[in-house]
Each structure stands twice: as C-alpha cells, then as structure tokens.
Amino acid sequence: KNRVPVVMIGDGSMTAGMVYEALNELGDLKYPVVIILNDNEMSIAKPIGAISKYLSKLLAGKYYQGFKGKVDKFIKNNMPEGTTYIAKRMEEALKLITPGILFEEMGIDYIGPIDGHDIDEIIDTLQIAKAMNKPVIVHARTVKGKGYKIAEGQHEHWHGVGPFNVEDGAFVKKEAPKAATAVFADALSSLACKYDNVVGVTAAMPCGPGIIKLMDKFPVRFWDVAIAEQHAMSHIHI
C-alpha cells in the first residue's frame, strides 16, 4: 500500500538524545517516513541549549528551499557532459549554507521552515515529502496558543489549564489543600537556605514542580538541562 508513516516531535523534545539515536538509524535504513518538527520555540518553559539555538538559526534560511531549487536546475541544465565532478562540488558547496545541514548530513532530507498555521502550505508540503519516498523532516513554525491572544503571550502558564474565563483569561480558583508541588518547593527552598550543597536540576519544567523558587533565590545552584531526563540524572553526579 502507498502509505508513509508520519510522526511528530516538538522542538523542545529535540534536545533528547534518543531523538538522534532514532535519526541515526533512520538515515542508514532510508525508510520512507515524514517527521513533522513542530517548532513553537517552547517546550514547557523557555527552551535552552545548542539545539534550540540551531533551530532558531534555521529561520534565517526560510527562503533557502527556493534558492536551492534554482541552483539545482542551473547545474542540471547548464553543466556540460563530463563535468559531473564540478557539479558535485558545487552541490556540496551549496550544502554549506543549507539550513537543515545537521539532518541532511545524517541522511535525512529537510524541508522548511513552513508556516504551521497555513493549511494549504502544510498539505502541499506533506504531499511533496510523501512523494520523496525517503526519510524527510518537515520543519513547521507554529505559535503556541495561536488564535487566543492571552495564551499567545503567556505560553508557560497555558501549557495545561483548568477552567478559566474566556474574556480575560482569569483562571477559576477552587478551594483546595496546598499542592504537593508547592510543599516540595517550600521545603527545597528552605533546605537550600540552610545547606549550600543543595542544588536543583530540572528537565525543562522549572514551574511545574516549583523548583523555580530555588532558581530565583540561588540561580548558580540551578540547572535546566532541557527535555533530557537521562542527562538530568547523570548531570546530578557531576
């Protein structure tokens, strides 16, 4: 059957090592699959690390695909017979300015960035990706909370929400005992004040468990390792 698997991953999750283990294997097997990279410049909290910076740089190359197509066409139509070597070198030189060179060097084609809110562009791009019949990453830029201005401006607070007032975005407060995360945050902060060897490590979630209180008080004793839980555990022992 003419089916191509489609998987989706967020830019925040691109900091996890397992992603590159999978891409490494996929680039070798050349199995046809479309990977949608949903890039909203957010994980849960503000993304950090080299991969996040790399994805941001890709935005500077948003017009690259059209440019590359023109160069490829020029090489095909204008290079005479017997100049295959020169054409190949030109193609390799072009790769030096490829925004998706990280993925292409792993054997995975790259398309993008595209507007993740433009349905027509998404459909056209996915059809192109499917027809390529090999592993390809479609880099889609999106805005978290798109369509609701209040959420667009407060990404972290609107990652997961309960009841709220649509008009002003105010959350409906309920009488409830102190949350376990709040108890943890207070205890951690108190211990950190008492012992200078108490540190905090989080995997892109400083607010959820309340560890942000430690970050505010003792920023040099706090690390956010992005969405990389395995690394977080090994980082603790450094």
Residue ranges of predicted features:
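Thiamine diphosphate
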Residues: 1-38, 204-236
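Conserved beta-strand scaffold positions in the cores of enzyme catalytic domains, especially
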Residues: 35, 110-113, 137, 200, ...
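Long, well-ordered, tryptophan-enriched scaffold segments
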Residues: 40-187
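Active-site lining segments that contact anionic ligands and/or coordinate catalytic metals
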Residues: 133-135, 195, 230
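Short beta->alpha junction loops
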Residues: 113-118, 203, 226-227
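Active-site diphosphate/adenylate-binding microenvironment
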Residues: 185-207, 212
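Solvent-exposed alpha-helices and their adjacent loops that cap or buttress functional pockets
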Residues: 1-2, 7, 25-29, 95, ...
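Generic beta-sheet signal
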Residues: 3-6, 33, 134-142, 198
